[in-house]
Amino acid sequence: MSEPLRVAVLQGGRSLERAVSLRSGAQVRDGLGRLGHTAIPIDAGGELVGELIAAQPDVAFIALHGRHGEDGTIQEVLEALQIPYTGSGPAACVRATDKVLAKHLMRAAGIPTPPFFALHDHVVKQLGGADALPSIEERLGFPMVVKPAHGGSALGVKFARQGSELPGAMVGAFSYDVRLLLERHIA
């Protein structure tokens, strides 16, 4: 085995996926310990940068989920501190965590993806966007998947099997993000 590493395990944070992240962090720490490495748990809160500097890790293992963990934010901080880390770089994270952008990139690359529409809550609440729903329903059909444009762990994902279920599904998705994705369900 190579020399043991000091690994900062970044976990928790302030996203809606905090609980998932804490469980992931515990599993990572256990695995690193079994491999003979020193795991340094760091809850990604208000003192994160100072804690990273003080810990002087050889590498950071990103066990964060959701905003600021998977969206390129923490990766940019680690790069600024010159701390190597697990996972993708900031640009790839930004592309992957924005579901609407990711779908546009897939289409541009010729990768099949179900038909979709994106709506911002401002459009729905203040610009009469709800009037576009019959057209969207006609073009996507039912069942339809309604999900926040950002985030993971299936938080806020709802299925609308018919038109009467769509408003409730949208309210649920909007409780997680200001933008949502309406997508044809593929069985």
Regions found by a protein language model. Give the residues of each.
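ATP-binding N-terminal substructure of ATP-dependent carboxylate-amine bond-forming enzymes
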Residues: 1-108, 120-134
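Acidic/histidine-enriched active-site and ligand-binding environments that engage anionic O-linkages
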Residues: 133-144
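Glycine-rich beta-alpha junction loops
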Residues: 123, 150-152, 186-187
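Basic phosphate/pyrophosphate-binding loop/patch that engages nucleotide-derived ligands
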Residues: 105-113, 172
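Hydrophobic beta-strand scaffold residues
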Residues: 39, 84-85, 113, 144, ...
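Phosphate-binding site of ATP-dependent enzymes
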Residues: 158-187
